Amino acid sequence: HLPVEHLARIEEDGYTVIEDAFSEAYADEIHEELMVHMEDDATRGVQKAAMLLQRGPIFEEMALHPYILALHQKLLGPDMNLAHYIGSRKPVVADTHSMHNDPPHPAPGTEGACFDSTAIWAITDFGEDDGPTLVVPGTHKLNRKPDADAIERAVKVVMPRGSIAMWHGALWHGAA
């Protein structure tokens, strides 16, 4: 089962990183299968693979990982559904992804509610200089779009291969 500190951290900070969530051998399997489906997105300088659930059993296994289910159910409740399932690869030289929260956040009168959540699997190391995901801890509680200076308060989500990062959809996040 998922260590309780991750449930507490996602409530307090809006995100958590679970290290050693899967093996390096499994990361290799995921990478190999994912690269078969990657397509270049020349407009943003990234590679993407969409609709992964239908692309092979390994992607079904990933969606049903016990840590993934535990945190998504904590945030969204037992009747959640999988809306988007993509893989992406952003070279360090690619443009940043501006700070944002995920629709439908913010939604007036819904303070504290979570309508979506995200999980990122580190099939490679996410280092300080690799253009990692950025988050502003605690902003999932604000129920508003990011401030103009949000990036100045952001922290890098640095994690070793085999980790899973997850966050509340209202959390301000982007990419370096």
Where are the language model's segments positioned?
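Non-heme Fe(II)-dependent double-stranded beta-helix
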Residues: 1-111
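Short hydrophobic-aromatic micro-motifs
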Residues: 17-18, 121, 165-167
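Short, solvent-exposed loop/turn segments at secondary-structure junctions
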Residues: 23-25, 87-90, 126-128, 140-141, ...
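Catalytic core of non-heme Fe(II) oxygenases with the double-stranded beta-helix
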Residues: 95-158
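Conserved metal-binding segment of the jelly-roll/cupin
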Residues: 158-173
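Ligand-binding loop in jelly-roll beta-barrel domains
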Residues: 176
